Regions:
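Conserved phosphate- and dinucleotide-binding cores of soluble alpha/beta proteins
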Residues: 4-24, 29-32, 43-44, 50, ...
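Minor-groove-contacting beta-hairpin "wing" of winged helix-turn-helix DNA-binding domains
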Residues: 53-60
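Short glycine/proline- and acidic residue-enriched helix-loop micro-motifs
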Residues: 64-72, 143-145
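Helix-turn-helix/homeodomain-like alpha-helical modules used for DNA recognition
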Residues: 69-112, 118-120
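A residue-level structural signature of the nucleotidyltransferase/glycosyltransferase Rossmann-like core
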Residues: 117-118, 171
Length: 260
């Protein structure tokens, strides 16, 4: 009962942009204390923003849910995307693995690959590689360096961007905040976007990995036009008209199915 009410509260706030405690009490016929507790817990999960007297949606273009929250969202879809992306990696490849929860799933799925060089600005990805792959026979790991972004465990700043500028890789696996026909590839954070740009520029093959919730969305800052992408790997919930539009631009769309 509680979880269903909170799910509906979240839907209402996201659809309308915001609701007062009084309005939600009337709609669900519960006490103010109950609604305030629901809003507090939803805020702690990063699903909405609690304000004085109510709550507002956090789906603005500059708001990105915390990393710890994103790791629990669409996790089965992300795992499927990660497996499909890893299947494109060949022994001997040099890779750039972007920061993010979907690219982390690629690192999970790289076991069995040999003689890889992996460049990343992500501490969770580096930790995954160190823990589960042999750095002597299978992987050479390069961290970009830079300033660690609090809460994200990723590296940003001129050092990180310059490192990507100094290396040319076979394949870059790119995570983004949004993919739209009008705005192209976009991100929530300007500093993240500045690090992604040289990574994309210096990759021979550019593979965007994003669950379908990112498709059709525009976030805060531009990263690159859509046409830089050779491939998009996403899940089966993507709108078919968007698939057709992307393919018309020459972008291969690969659908990762859960359980494959």
């Amino acid at each position: 009962m509680q979880s269903e009410r909170r799910r509906k509260i979240l839907e209402i706030v996201q659809e309308t942009g915001g609701r007062s405690v009084t309005e939600l009490c009337e709609q669900f016929d519960v006490s103010e204390m109950t609604i305030r507790r629901d809003l507090r817990d939803l805020d702690r999960e990063g699903l909405l923003r609690k304000v004085h007297g109510g709550a507002v949606s956090n789906l603005g273009r500059s708001y990105e849910p915390p990393y710890a929250v994103r790791t629990t969202r669409n996790d089965e879809k992300k795992r499927a995307i990660g497996r499909m992306a890893a299947s494109l990696v060949e022994d001997g490849d040099s890779l750039a693995l972007d920061v993010g929860t979907t690219t982390l799933e690629i690192a999970h799925a790289l076991q069995g690959k040999r003689n890889l060089t992996i460049l990343t600005a992500s501490l969770p990805i580096a930790n995954e590689i160190v823990a589960n792959l042999s750095l002597t026979t299978e992987v050479r790991l390069i961290l970009t360096g830079g300033i660690v972004r609090s809460g994200e465990l990723s590296m940003i700043g001129s050092i990180a961007a310059r490192t990507y500028s100094d290396f040319h890789v076979d394949k870059a696996f790119i995570g983004v905040g949004g993919i739209s026909l009008d705005a192209g590839l976009t991100e929530y954070n300007l500093e993240d976007a500045m690090v992604k740009k040289p990574m994309i520029q210096n990759a021979q093959q550019r593979i965007v990995v994003a669950d379908s919730s990112k498709v059709g969305r525009t976030t805060f800052t531009a990263v690159a036009p859509l046409t830089v992408a050779n491939t998009l790997i996403t899940d089966s919930d993507i709108d078919r008209t968007m698939v057709n539009a992307l393919e018309d631009l020459g972008i291969e769309v690969m659908i990762a199915k859960e359980g494959d």
